[in-house]
Amino acid sequence: MDFLPLFHSLQGRLALVVGGGEVALRKARLLADAGARLRVVAPQIHIELRHLVEQGGGELLERDYQDGDQPGCALIIAATDDEPLNAEVSRAANARGIPVNVVDAPALCSVIFPAIVDRSPLVVAVSSGGDAPVLARLIRAKLETWIPSSYGQLAGLASRFRNRVKELLPDLQQRRVFWENLFQGEIAERVLAGRPAEAERLLEERLAGGLAHMATGEVYLVGAGPGDPDLLTFRALRLMQQADVVLYDRLVAPAILELCRRDAERLYVGKRRAEHAVPQERINRLLVELASQGKRVLRLKGGDPFIFGRGGEEIDELAAHGIPFQVVPGITAASGCAAYAGIPLTHRDHAQSVRFVTGHLKDGTTDLPWKDLVAPGQTLVFYMGLVGLPVICEQLVAHGRSAQTPAALIQQGTTAQQRVFSGTLENLPQLVAEHEVHAPTLVIVGEVVQLRDKLAWFEGAREGA
C-alpha cells in the first residue's frame, strides 16, 4: 500500500490553490465542500472559481505564485500546466511539512485525491494511488449506483441517537448487534423509502421501550419489469437482495428471480388462464401471515404491480391489518415491450393518446367499450390478449376500425427470446396461429406499429414477420 487512506479535517482552515483554470476549480470545489477557507493564486482566475472564493470569504491573489503564499496553510494544491512551477510548489510545501497535491504528478504529491462517493456524513473514497485514476472513477461510478443517496440520512439518524444507545447498551457487542439490526431492518427501510420522520419516530419508540421489542415484518411490493434484468430499478434490486421470503408469479423472468437473496425462501404463487396455483385471497393472507412473523416479504410481480397486477388488492389487505409495506414501480410491459420492438406508443403524426386494456377472455368474449377503442389517433395495448386475439381483432373491425390497421403481437418482450409478429387486424390472428406462440405476450394496435419497419433496434429470437 503506497498511500495510507486518511480523512483530513479542513473545517475553517486555510487551503492554498495555485492555479486559476478548470482543474483548479474542480479541486477548489472539493476543498470548499469540506469547509476549507480558500486562498487562490494565479495571474488569471476562472470566473466560477472567483465566485466560489468570494462566497466562502477566501483570498484571491491575481498574480504569480510566491514562496510566501504557503505559511499558515493546512493543504496546498498545485493545479497549473507549468511543470517547473508545480515542482517548486511541491518542494516548498514538503520543506515546510505541509501536505501537498500536484495534479497529474503523483511523484510530487505527499497526498492524493481519491474518487469520492459522497453520502455525507457517510463518505466512500476509492484510490489507485495515482496509477489508474480512470479505473478509480469507474469503480466510484459503480458504487454510486449501489449506495442509495439516502444513506447519508441514515448515517445522520444514527449519529443523533448514538449517545442514547450507548447509555442504554454499555456493552460494545450489544451495541454492535443493535446497530446491525437497525441498518438492515424496518427503521432503515423507512429512511431509504423517503420517510425519515417515521423512521425517527420508530427509533424513539424502540429506545423508550428499553429496546425490548418484537421484530416487525414488512412487505415489499416490487415490479420486476417486462423481463430484462437491466430494467430493474436500484430500489427493486436492493429489496430483492434483503428479503427473507419471496412470493413470485409466472411473469417474473428466471434471470430476475436469480437476483434475489440466495437463502431466501421462495414461494411460487403464479397464475395461468383459468388456473390459479394459489388463489388471490390466499396470496393476500400469506403476505399478512409472513409479515406478522417478523419477516421481510418480497412480493415480486412482472411488469408494474399497479397495472393489471392486482397490487391494489394486496396492499389493501396489508393496510387493513396494519402491516408496513412499500411499493416499487416497475417498467410495465406496454412501455418495455413496445420500446424493444421499435414501436413508439405515441407519435405526433400517428397517435396522441395510448390506452392500456385487458384482453383477458371470460366465457369466450371480452366486455370492453369497443366504440371508445376505435376512436382515431390512439394506440391500443392489450395485456393478456393471446387467447382473445381473434375476438379482439374481429370486434375492433366490427365497430369501425379498418381491417388494414397495423397490429403486432410481442412474445417475451425485452428478453433474448423476444419475437415480434407484425401484420394488420385482418391477418395478425392467422399469422400468430401459424407459429407456436406462448405467453407472456402483448398486443399493440395502431398506426404507430408501422414505424417498426424503421425503428426496430433490438434483435431477439427469430421474428414472426
Swiss-Prot record:
Family the UniProt entry places it in: In the N-terminal section; belongs to the precorrin-2 dehydrogenase / sirohydrochlorin ferrochelatase family. In the C-terminal section; belongs to the precorrin methyltransferase family.
Q: What is the name of the protein in this document?
A: Siroheme synthase
The reply on keyword Chloroplast is no
> Please, one GO biological process term?
siroheme biosynthetic process
Report the EC number(s), separated by commas if there are several.
2.1.1.107, 1.3.1.76, 4.99.1.4
- Keywords assigned: Cobalamin biosynthesis, Lyase, Methyltransferase, Multifunctional enzyme, NAD, Oxidoreductase, Phosphoprotein, Porphyrin biosynthesis, S-adenosyl-L-methionine, Transferase
Pfam family, any one: CysG_dimeriser
Renumbered residue ranges of the record's region Precorrin-2 dehydrogenase /sirohydrochlorin ferrochelatase? 1-203
Described function: Then it catalyzes the NAD-dependent ring dehydrogenation of precorrin-2 to yield sirohydrochlorin. Finally, it catalyzes the ferrochelation of sirohydrochlorin to yield siroheme.
Q: Which SUPFAM superfamilies match?
A: NAD(P)-binding Rossmann-fold domains (SSF51735), Siroheme synthase middle domains-like (SSF75615), Tetrapyrrole methylase (SSF53790)
Residues annotated as the enzyme's active site: D249, K271
Mark the residues carrying the PTM Phosphoserine: S128
Instruction: State one molecular function term (GO).
Output: sirohydrochlorin ferrochelatase activity
Note the HAMAP family from the entry.
Siroheme_synth
Which pathway does this chain act in? Cofactor biosynthesis; adenosylcobalamin biosynthesis; precorrin-2 from uroporphyrinogen III: step 1/1; Cofactor biosynthesis; adenosylcobalamin biosynthesis; sirohydrochlorin from precorrin-2: step 1/1; Porphyrin-containing compound metabolism; siroheme biosynthesis; precorrin-2 from uroporphyrinogen III: step 1/1; Porphyrin-containing compound metabolism; siroheme biosynthesis; siroheme from sirohydrochlorin: step 1/1
* Domain of life (superkingdom): Bacteria
